[in-house]
């Protein structure tokens, strides 16, 4: 059957598939346009399966809120290359999926994938994008925040977006909320405050802080003992340095062995007799510093470093606070 260029172009406009793929589909389906569309869809599904082991690390991350700011969503639509990820059609598709979530206040990723747009599920439309772009395309994330007021921030380039939910709507909240959403994008907090940090993370940070404190106290004692023996601690702080400095003639083999013995004995003695309360005091200080650096409300405000984010919010309204936030980034 003779397939015309007009037929090929029409199918291409309808599906976004490549010219040669459209021509092949029409030939295989004897010019039947609807059958050719199904053929291309099936091909897209096969492409998706064939590319299942490919990494889809590029794409678009975009957020938005409802007009009343009580619901916000951020999606991540992934592909393989920045070229496709920055393509207007790809970004447009991502925005379309996001708008569906916003308009219908969709709660989770599975519900969004199953949602129908013009008779097609979002999951099918994502598969179509695989056929259209020739790359593995995945809808990986839908994060949602519902609160009395939700602010969003989209970083330039569609690679990073945030949502921040507040416990109340107050006069002038737009500017304050936007600044906090920008802060969350820039400073990468892991939790709202200390109470929001998972217990597993708290336990891990405390264990690290305790061990680090003990080792530092032992090292201080070792350094004092080495100096008393006439050995520069910097020359013997590792086996590599010991061997290197012996080769340079900076220390003798006897000094190297003496340093090893001092390190072993003083470390063991220090750890055996260390004051646990002192260790816990220092470790608690380190964990508190971790909270200040990683919890949104306790971080120094990006706009005014003289106050925390909590203080920045309460400057606008004493009763206002953050009740939820999401931060999604490519990579």
What residue spans do the PLM features occupy?
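N-terminal assembly/interaction segments in proteins that build large macromolecular machines
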Residues: 2-331
């Amino acid at each position: 059957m003779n397939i015309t260029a007009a037929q090929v172009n029409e199918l291409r406009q309808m599906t976004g598939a490549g010219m040669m793929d459209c021509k092949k589909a029409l030939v295989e389906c004897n010019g039947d346009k609807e059958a050719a569309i199904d053929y291309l869809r099936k091909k897209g599904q096969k492409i998706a399966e064939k590319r299942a082991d490919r990494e889809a690390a590029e794409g678009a991350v975009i957020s938005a809120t409802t007009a009343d700011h009580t619901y916000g969503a951020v999606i991540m639509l992934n592909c393989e290359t920045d070229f496709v990820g920055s393509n207007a059609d790809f970004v447009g598709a991502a925005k379309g999926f996001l708008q569906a979530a916003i308009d219908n206040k969709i709660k989770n990723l599975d519900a969004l994938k199953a949602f129908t747009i013009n008779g097609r599920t979002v999951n099918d439309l994502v598969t179509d994008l695989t056929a259209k772009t020739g790359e593995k395309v995945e809808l990986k994330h839908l994060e949602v925040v519902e609160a009395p007021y939700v602010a969003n921030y989209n970083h330039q380039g569609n690679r990073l977006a945030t949502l921040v939910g507040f416990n109340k709507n107050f006069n002038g909240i737009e500017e304050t909320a936007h600044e906090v959403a920008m802060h969350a994008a820039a400073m990468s907090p892991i939790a709202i405050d200390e109470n929001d940090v998972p217990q597993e993370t708290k336990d891990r940070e405390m264990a690290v802080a305790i061990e680090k404190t003990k080792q530092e106290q032992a090292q201080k004692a070792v350094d004092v003992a080495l100096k008393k023996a006439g050995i520069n601690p910097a020359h013997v702080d590792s086996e590599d340095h010991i061997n290197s400095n012996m080769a340079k003639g900076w220390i003798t083999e006897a000094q190297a062995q003496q340093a090893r013995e001092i390190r072993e004995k003083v470390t063991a003695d220090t750890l055996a007799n260390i004051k646990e309360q002192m260790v816990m005091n220092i470790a608690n200080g380190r964990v508190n510093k971790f909270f200040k650096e990683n919890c949104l409300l306790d971080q120094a405000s990006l706009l005014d470093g003289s106050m925390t984010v909590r203080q920045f919010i309460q400057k606008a309204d004493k009763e206002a606070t953050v009740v939820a936030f999401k931060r999604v980034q490519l990579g």
